[in-house]
Amino acid sequence: MNSRDGLLAEIKNKAVVHGKVILSSGKEANYYVDLRRVTLDAVAAPLVGEVMLDLTADLEFDAVGGLTLGADPVATAMLHAAAKRGRQLDAFV
């Protein structure tokens, strides 16, 4: 199984919540996708880094980041995946 397929399986198994869910808006939904359950997971987070590096392979960049809280674990996962590949990549928040 490649990283992308593994990540998809992790998302389906850990991030998708089925059943009645009350959203922060107060509205009701039949399902909810909580990707924090993936980006902060010991098995899934490395897959996030691998897949994000693969998806951005054609771009030139030296650092990754975004709005704090949501982007922090993604940037960190990419930093570690890059190091594993022998590439120096910084993260910022």
PLM regions: where:
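Conserved PRPP/pyrophosphate-binding segment of the phosphoribosyltransferase/PRPP-pathway fold
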Residues: 39, 43-93
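Active-site-facing substrate-recognition patch
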Residues: 1-59
